[in-house]
């Protein structure tokens, strides 16, 4: 990965060395390409989102950030507002509507999908009734990027169509930044995005978990059962119950 002067200057927004997947995702943003980030938990997927906010607001473009749940939307709104005090942020959830004219709008995935769907209907019918929309601006000219957090929800049986329809309804020239820690077969989603037209997709992944993952189990049984076993038998019993688990811990003294 050879860093050019533009990228080197942009990377200085952070006071630490960026990992390869972060560098590639930022390169995609700087080149107005799509980026699909599939990185392990704790590896720093927020950095590409921050890069999108910095880059596109500096170009006087607006940014939309979506998540599948209100709690995450509220959390990111608070985090970004505290970190980027020179950028205006707004939030749209079923319970809250604040500053819809902001530089960066954070919302649930359904609100973006519904807005895109309504805008498409209004456009086809030559109807102009902005009161039907949760928010409104010129996507083609004013929107710089859409960030879709927890993008693995596209595989959800009940809600996955929300992400599919959002991708299909978004003007193809608008870059998408999708973030996930658990997305299976990301190359298929990348192909799906590219098939709608527009820029190519940079698939930015990690190969090693930065935060170790441990599996532990704990079993409780009635005291009357415990009294029937000696120490060795207890351990064998628990081992049978915990078979198939990655790790287990047996207390010596009960």
Located regions from the model:
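The conserved Walker
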Residues: 41
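Pre-Walker A (Motif I) flank of P-loop NTPase domains
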Residues: 31-37, 61-62, 102-103, 174-175
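Walker A/P-loop NTP-binding motif
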Residues: 27-34, 45-59, 79, 164-170
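Conserved nucleic-acid-binding Ia/Ib motif block in the N-terminal RecA-like helicase ATPase lobe
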Residues: 61-114, 191
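Residues immediately C-terminal
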Residues: 72, 98, 150-154, 185
């Amino acid at each position: 990965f050879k860093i050019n002067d533009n990228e080197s200057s942009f990377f200085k927004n952070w006071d630490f060395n960026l990992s390869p997947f972060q560098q590639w995702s930022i390169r995609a943003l700087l080149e107005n390409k799509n980026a699909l980030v599939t990185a392990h938990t704790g590896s720093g997927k927020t950095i590409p989102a921050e890069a999108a906010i910095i880059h596109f607001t500096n170009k006087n473009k607006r940014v939309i950030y979506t998540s599948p749940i209100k709690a995450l939307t509220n959390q990111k709104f608070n985090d970004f507002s505290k970190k980027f005090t020179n950028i205006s942020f707004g939030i749209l959830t079923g319970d809250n509507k604040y500053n819809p004219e902001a530089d960066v709008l954070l919302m649930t995935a359904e609100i973006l999908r519904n807005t895109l769907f309504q805008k498409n209907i209004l456009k086809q019918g030559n109807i102009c009734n902005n009161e039907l929309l949760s928010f409104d601006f010129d996507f083609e000219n004013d929107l710089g990027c859409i960030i879709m957090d927890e993008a693995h929800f596209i595989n959800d049986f009940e809600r996955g169509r929300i992400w599919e329809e959002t991708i299909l309804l978004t003007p193809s020239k608008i870059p998408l930044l999708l973030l996930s820690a658990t997305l299976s077969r990301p190359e298929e989603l990348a192909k799906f995005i590219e098939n709608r037209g527009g820029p190519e997709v940079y698939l930015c992944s990690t190969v090693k978990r930065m935060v170790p993952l441990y599996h532990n189990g704990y079993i409780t049984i009635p005291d009357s059962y415990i009294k029937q076993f000696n120490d060795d038998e207890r351990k064998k019993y628990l081992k049978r119950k915990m078979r198939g688990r990655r790790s287990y811990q047996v207390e010596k003294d009960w």
